[in-house]
């Protein structure tokens, strides 16, 4: 069994599979992805594979630079997006927006 390249919390699985979540915002530890990468995706909770995605772009961003468009791409409101990021990365201020496309 191949290892997964990236994981998402289970609550995001349906949105990824339906194409409603088209970006992910990560900290520096996951800023190495690049456009064209094909990634196996697993659930964070159990590492179970659930799809394959392609990275379309990777760009730096701060919490204050997040817009309604980013929130829409995450399938949530802007205030909710900022709260989710602060909860996942409480001590970080610089992030990377990874634009993704579902492959299968």
UniProtKB/Swiss-Prot annotation:
SUPFAM superfamilies: PUA domain-like (SSF88697). It catalyses: N(4)-acetylcytidine + H2O = cytidine + acetate + H(+); N(4)-acetyl-2'-deoxycytidine + H2O = 2'-deoxycytidine + acetate + H(+); N(4)-acetylcytosine + H2O = cytosine + acetate + H(+). It comes from the Bacteria. Keywords: Hydrolase. The active site is at residues 21, 24, 74. One of its GO terms (molecular function) is hydrolase activity, acting on carbon-nitrogen (but not peptide) bonds, in linear amidines. Residues 6-102 form the ASCH domain. CDD domains: ASCH_yqfb_like (cd06552). Its EC number is 3.5.1.135. One of its GO terms (cellular component) is cytosol. Catalyzes the hydrolysis of N(4)-acetylcytidine (ac4C). Belongs to the N(4)-acetylcytidine amidohydrolase family. This is N(4)-acetylcytidine amidohydrolase.
């Amino acid at each position: 069994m191949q290892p997964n390249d990236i994981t998402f919390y289970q609550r995001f699985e349906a949105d990824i599979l339906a194409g409603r979540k088209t970006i992910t915002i990560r900290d520096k530890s996951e800023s190495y992805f690049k456009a064209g990468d094909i990634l196996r995706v697993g659930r964070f909770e159990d590492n179970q594979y659930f799809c394959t995605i392609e990275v379309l772009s990777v760009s730096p961003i701060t919490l204050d630079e997040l817009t309604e468009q980013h929130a829409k791409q995450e399938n949530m409101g802007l205030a909710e997006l900022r709260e989710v990021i602060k909860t996942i990365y409480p001590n970080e201020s610089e992030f990377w927006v990874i634009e993704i496309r579902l492959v299968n």
